[in-house]
Regions:
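Active-site helix of classical SDR
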Residues: 121, 157, 165
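Alpha-helical segment proximal to the catalytic Tyr-Lys
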Residues: 126, 170-174, 231
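Conserved glycine-rich cofactor-binding loop
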Residues: 13-15
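Substrate-binding pocket helix/loop in short-chain dehydrogenase/reductase
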Residues: 97-98, 105-110, 203
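C-terminal substrate-recognition "lid" of short-chain dehydrogenase/reductases
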Residues: 118, 133, 177, 211-240, ...
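Residue(s) in the substrate-gating loop at a strand-loop-helix junction
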Residues: 141
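Conserved glycine-rich Rossmann-like NAD(P)H-binding loop of the short-chain dehydrogenase/reductase
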Residues: 27-44
Length: 246
């Protein structure tokens, strides 16, 4: 019987991250998922993943802290002896216009979104290099490409992820490790569900497909780049945005 592959997904307990985790579970991957403090939905998730006949390891990890990321990877390797796929999805927003933004809110977003991506990737790459194989998919955003008023911290973090990904793709290609970005547009999640209907309508008007994306559509794109069928794409940014950026 073929050994199951292992995917480590940060921010994988809710929203887009949860959809990504489910996609990998459906395809028989064992999972490593981090959580920060909220354990309320972990039992529910455990039950949900049971039907896929896989193992899931939940590890409390603040991705902005390098030592915690190192420990998460160490525990994952002890459990599964490998990590085939890394999806850096953990992210937060602290939106405000530049004139009102506090240095603390700028730093928090950079620390989770960009530094967190560095921390987890740096912790995992030595194991992938030893195996001479691996897939890394980092979740950026269309605002990392285009910018967005009121989100200079978030846009900077997501633009940084693109530069980071292209750089590591060049460094790791000789070891058969592929690194790519998925850049979602407006996606229908808990974060967007609080928006008023008027705001949603104005957002949809900017999108050629006239609707927000679904988390599952992001998950499908991530799985394509991280799955076995991708053997020749690296250092790329896949915009999944309903045609916003062309």
């Amino acid at each position: 019987m073929e050994e199951k592959k292992v995917a480590l997904i940060t921010g994988g307990t809710r929203g887009i991250g949860k959809a990504i985790a489910i996609k990998f579970a459906q395809n028989g991957y064992n999972l490593v998922l981090n959580y920060v403090s909220d354990r309320t939905n972990l039992e529910e998730l455990k039950q949900e993943f049971k039907k896929y006949n896989i193992e899931v390891l939940f590890i409390k990890t603040d991705v902005s802290k390098f030592e915690e990321c190192e420990n998460m990877v160490k525990l994952a390797i002890e459990k599964f002896n490998k990590i085939d796929v890394l999806v850096n999805n953990a992210g937060i927003t602290k939106d405000s216009l530049l004139l009102r933004m506090t240095p603390e809110d700028f730093e928090k977003v950079i620390n989770i979104n960009l530094k967190g991506t560095f921390n987890v990737t740096k912790s995992i790459v030595p194991y992938m290099m030893k195996k001479r194989t691996g897939k890394i998919v980092n979740i950026s955003s269309v605002v990392g490409v285009s910018g967005n008023a009121g989100q200079c911290n978030y846009a900077a973090s997501k633009a940084g992820i693109i530069g980071f990904t292209k750089s590591i793709a060049k460094e790791l290609a000789s070891r058969n490790i592929l690194a790519n970005c998925v850049a979602p547009g407006f996606i229908d999640t808990d974060m967007t569900s609080v928006l008023s209907e008027n705001v949603k309508e104005s957002i949809n008007a900017q999108i050629p497909l006239k609707r927000m994306g679904r988390s599952e559509e992001i998950a499908n794109s991530v799985y394509f780049l991280a799955g076995e069928e991708n053997t020749y794409i690296t250092g790329q940014v896949l915009n999944v945005d309903g045609g916003m950026l062309m």
